[in-house]
Amino acid sequence: MVKQKDYTIDSDLYSKIEIYLKNKDIKFIEKAYNFAREAHDGQLRLSGEDFFEHPKQTAIFLADLKLDSSTIAAALLHDVVEDCDCDSQDIERIFGLDVSRLVDGVTKLSRNDVIGDSEFSPTTNFYDEDIPEDIAQAETLRKMLMAMADDVRVVLIKLADRLHNMRTISFLPLNRRLAMSRETIEIYAPLAHRLGIWEIKWLLEDLSF
């Protein structure tokens, strides 16, 4: 059996995926892991940690749910199109159509977030624009439900993405934290409930108060 030392991949992620995935699938995830790590090289979050820690933690949580290799790879890559010098054609060419579609789906959903992943960057100017008092809940929820109908894995990645962002929300200004918490309670926790993923639902609710 191939051991963790034979992979250039985080031990926390490896320890979860080696339980249920074949070696070829782990190699595929390793490829996405290294691609995303290099793409995000030099980028930081407000916490001071490497930006890559965010997609890595997103992937680790989905590995807890024992999702397929394409989903784990897409979780690792979910910010590269929006935040790096990379486009969806690059993702499709290197990782295939399935992963590319998942990344595109998450990218489209993220554009509806009141607080996006990019706002966790220390270069963000929080005073460029005000947050609207009324979050467009119905429109955002409609798009997420449409994504569920197309491929539920897109929403699962987005839920894991939101979970890690909520765990690091303390580094945002108060107005951003309040807006993001409200959006999480009104949109993301109910979606987790709808999917029957109780652990994510409870965690999101706890982190929103």
Please identify what each model-predicted range represents.
Residues M1-F209:
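Active-site helical microenvironments for divalent-metal-assisted chemistry
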